[in-house]
């Protein structure tokens, strides 16, 4: 019997975009799929539109979220619990997949039954596919864990096909987090040795929309979201030590610095200071790096960064912690790669 792909889609107030997503699913050359849309309390016509599609094609089903807490990852996990697929794929209601997406992904996975998941190339767009002409990201010489530390991820939620059993075994999405859910998920996969390959020899099959309604600066640096980042970093440190990779703790310095500098810029100096003390005790930053970070904290605390010389000094002290990620920055004229590589 052909393998069934379960497409799990959280929805919330996407009446203007959800039809495009549904149409792209209906256009698949691989007919063996089901789509479970779990609605998170939409107040517009999103549910009505999905229900109209479901009435025309029984492979599409819509549910109201019943799990807690509210949020997209809760909807995704609840969908996984209800689905029947051999594979699971996550698709948001503002993204679009190419007609060959499922067929290429299934055939890639079935060529190697030992894989837990596979990563596929995707493109960024704003209004219509190809309008930005940018890769989501490209292959580089560094291993995936190194790139994850540097905030230069090659994998994100919609660009991956998971074997359902593997996704359940890894623990699914972490519902305690408000941000960095994708980052935390793939840290778990890489550190714990899940088997994967990148099939960047295949054509891009996903169009990932640049969201104009992204978090404002105030929302992005809200205390609860900063604590979510802290939780991810601490969990990564725990996993590294538990999996015999404590020697990689210093690579956390990029994440540590990003969290601390973000907290400092938003006035959360107590959080920044306590997290710096934790990072130094764990070996995530060296004595010299801690001193450099502490200098930046002092400049923010004194509000001297309002003035040019102090602001430039703070920027210079932060520069060594930049991860130089290229997500959404590489034009499609740059080759993405021409090989399938990973952790076989």
Q: Model-found features: residue ranges?
A:
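C-terminal subregions of glycosyltransferases and related glycan-biosynthesis enzymes
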Residues: 184, 191, 198-344
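Cell-envelope/extracellular polymer assembly enzymes that use nucleotide-activated donors
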Residues: 3-6, 24, 34, 184
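Glycine-rich, basic loop-to-helix element that forms the pyrophosphate-binding segment
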Residues: 65-83, 104
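Short aromatic/hydrophobic "clamp" motif used to bind/position activated sugar donors
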Residues: 88
């Amino acid at each position: 019997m052909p393998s069934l792909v379960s497409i799990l889609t959280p929805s919330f107030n996407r009446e203007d975009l959800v039809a495009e997503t549904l149409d792209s699913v209906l256009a698949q050359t691989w007919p063996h799929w089901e789509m479970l849309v779990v609605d998170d309390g939409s107040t517009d016509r999103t549910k009505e539109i999905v229900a109209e599609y479901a009435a025309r094609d029984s492979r599409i089903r819509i549910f109201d979220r019943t799990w807690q807490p509210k949020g997209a990852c809760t909807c995704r996990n609840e969908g996984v619990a209800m689905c029947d697929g051999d594979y699971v794929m996550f698709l948001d209601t503002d993204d679009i997949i190419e007609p060959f997406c499922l067929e290429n992904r299934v055939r890639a996975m079935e060529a190697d039954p030992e894989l837990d998941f596979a990563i596929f190339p995707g493109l960024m767009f704003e209004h219509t596919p190809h309008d930005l002409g940018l890769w989501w990201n490209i292959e580089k010489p560094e291993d995936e864990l190194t790139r994850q530390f540097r905030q230069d991820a090659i994998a994100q939620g919609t660009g991956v096909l998971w074997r359902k059993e593997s996704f359940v075994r890894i623990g699914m999405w972490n519902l305690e987090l408000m941000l960095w859910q994708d980052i935390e998920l793939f840290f778990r996969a890489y550190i714990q040795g899940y088997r994967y390959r990148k099939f960047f020899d295949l054509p891009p099959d996903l169009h990932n929309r640049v969201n104009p309604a992204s978090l404002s600066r105030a929302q992005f640096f809200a205390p609860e979201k900063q604590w979510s980042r802290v939780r991810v970093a601490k969990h990564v440190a725990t996993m590294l030590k538990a999996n015999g990779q404590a020697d990689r703790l210093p690579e956390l310095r990029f994440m540590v610095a990003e969290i601390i500098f973000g907290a400092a810029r938003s006035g959360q100096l107590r959080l920044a200071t306590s997290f710096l003390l934790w990072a130094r005790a764990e070996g995530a930053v060296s004595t010299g790096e801690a001193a450099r970070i502490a200098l930046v904290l002092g400049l923010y605390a004194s509000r001297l960064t309002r003035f040019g010389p102090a602001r430039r000094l703070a920027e210079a002290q932060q520069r060594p912690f930049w991860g130089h990620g290229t997500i959404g920055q590489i034009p499609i004229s740059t080759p993405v790669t021409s090989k399938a590589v990973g952790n076989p």
